[in-house]
């Protein structure tokens, strides 16, 4: 297991990881040189995420060829930082959030929060719905393994994985070009339009098998 956490240097500094993106890349290359393919800890979204940091994270995952199966990809692309009670980030969130903020709630375990940038929060909401749908389509016996070749229905799962990556990139580009405004109704509409892309992909490959 390798806790990379981010492909964005500003985020790594905020996480106090004491490492850089280039050092993370070197670590992955070194492990692979010795035939080791680790599982990765990664945080796509956190309270201070920006569209730039999300883009950096996504480009990092693509460059390092980490998104190898639909199970792995779906987890990596929507994972949010968990703010556990007793951690500095939890305490910081408590100090920053007014009591009247309906977007953040605190339990005895963790803080539920909205990302400060509403555009990123909206993007996260869409991608979370998409990724959960992808996970629900996986076979019940599917293991979250980095080697998709161990599954009997590899072509279909590869297609699902490629569709998931394409949806993420297409939607992120829309937010970057401001073609998707932040509006709850529009966000729900975009989510509903993206989900059928999985059904279309799966139907095509079922017809070929």
Language model segments and positions:
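Conserved non-cysteine loop/helix-boundary elements of the Radical SAM core domain that shape
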Residues: 1-39, 43-67
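Residue-identity detector for glycine
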Residues: 3, 7, 35, 41, ...
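Radical SAM enzyme core and accessory elements
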Residues: 90-91, 96-209
């Amino acid at each position: 297991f390798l806790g990379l956490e981010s492909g964005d240097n500003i985020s790594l500094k905020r996480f106090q990881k004491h490492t850089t993106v280039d050092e993370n890349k070197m670590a992955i290359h070194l492990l692979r040189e010795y035939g080791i393919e680790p599982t990765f800890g990664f945080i796509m979204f956190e309270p201070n995420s920006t569209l730039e940091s999300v883009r950096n994270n996504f480009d990092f995952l693509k460059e390092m060829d980490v998104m190898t199966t639909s199970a792995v990809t779906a987890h990596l692309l929507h994972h949010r930082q968990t703010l556990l009670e007793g951690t500095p980030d939890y305490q910081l969130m408590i100090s920053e959030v007014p009591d009247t903020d309906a977007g953040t709630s605190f339990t005895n375990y963790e803080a539920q929060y909205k990302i400060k940038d509403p555009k990123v929060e909206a993007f996260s909401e869409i991608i979370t719905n998409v990724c959960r749908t992808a996970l629900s389509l996986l076979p019940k016996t599917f293991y979250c393994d980095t080697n998709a070749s161990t599954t009997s229905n590899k072509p279909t799962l590869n297609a699902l994985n490629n569709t998931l990556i394409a949806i993420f990139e297409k939607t992120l580009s829309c937010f970057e070009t401001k073609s998707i405004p932040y509006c709850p109704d529009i966000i729900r509409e975009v989510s509903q339009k993206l989900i059928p892309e999985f059904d279309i992909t799966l139907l095509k490959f079922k017809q070929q098998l």
